[in-house]
């Protein structure tokens, strides 16, 4: 499958959904599924300009751990527990259902601290034009240890940036967010422009496709997609399901 995350694709804009290799759990079917289950489906998107978003590095509680096929598991939301099961949220920062799911997932991470690993990975959807730029902004913030702060900011302000079509305007707004969060805006903007910034997002996307993720939010335990959980699930439901799937009593 051809990757949608080449620099050329980022500069050109969105690729056709068919080129991304995912069924459109988010075309006509997605809206009905979303309203029924609280999750918005869709195929992954490459609609972003390299000048519209950032890269990142690790923080104590929300760090990007190195791996994928080399061990990468995404951003950690709690302490690493070697050998323990891993619960992962596949998210899209423009998805309104992800905005509802992530705070609960963060609470679940606290309850599972020292018991299970809890991580977040990217799954930008083709139906969301600014999903990749938003993911880039989170990556850029992570470079300064503020992945979680930027993610929360983007979820809280979705209506302010989701419809922006001008790349420079989007870039300026994300830089304003970075300033509000106390980031070095020069370094943040440099990360947005860096072609390396897209790589963790691409890695997350490819891994999501590999394990069968078709929409967001999607929860997985040890790379097994979990059915029956969505943005309407309670924190207790998340915790109990994750523990059961990981064999934790």
Regions found by a protein language model. Give the residues of each.
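C-terminal cap of thioredoxin/glutaredoxin-like
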Residues: 2-5, 27-37, 41, 45, ...
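Short clusters of hydrophobic/aromatic residues that line enzyme substrate/ligand-binding pockets
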Residues: 77-79, 161, 226
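Surface-exposed charge patches
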Residues: 139, 176, 206
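Structural alpha/beta surface segment adjacent to cysteine/selenocysteine redox centers
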Residues: 88-94, 99-173
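Flexible, active-site-adjacent loop/turn segments at secondary-structure boundaries
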Residues: 70-75, 153, 190, 224
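Extracytoplasmic thiol/disulfide redox context detector
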Residues: 2-127, 241-249
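Internal amphipathic alpha-helical segments of the cytochrome P450 catalytic fold
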Residues: 22, 147-151, 185
